[in-house]
Amino acid sequence: MQLHFHIIGISLMILALIHIIFPKYFNWKEELKSLSLMNKQMMTIHTFFIALIVFLMGLLCLTSAGELTGTKLGKTVSLGLGIFWAIRLFVQFFGYSSKLWRGKPFETLIHIVFSGFWMYLNGVFWTNYLA
């Protein structure tokens, strides 16, 4: 189980760093032009904090796998992370329109890869909590 936590830790830290390219990749300079200053800043600041918390989740999994798998507190943290990633998996299917990826090879691949990743996270966190 600790190996899974290490894999998750590294993966989440990489995912967090990928957020750095979001403004350029999604062309936020143009796409967000029509938004108010408040909404523009909410997009960028919330993206930063999402990336930060994902990075810190990864760091926790990477550095504290033993505690997460071997203590009552670690199991409780796993429950919280399991709930978080279960909601994220739900949003993957019911929050985003399939129009964003259906019929687009790259976007479909990303949808499938991340759906699988969210399932993997759920499997590990819930299995650890219930063990």
Regions found by a protein language model. Give the residues of each.
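Hydrophobic alpha-helical segments at protein termini of multi-pass membrane proteins
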Residues: 38-45, 101, 119-122
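Juxtamembrane helix-entry segments on the extracytoplasmic side of multipass membrane proteins
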Residues: 3-5, 72-77
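Interfacial loop-to-transmembrane junctions
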Residues: 94-116
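Juxtamembrane boundary at the C-terminal end of a transmembrane helix
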Residues: 122-131
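Cytosolic juxtamembrane helix and N-cap/initiation of the first transmembrane helix
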Residues: 1-12
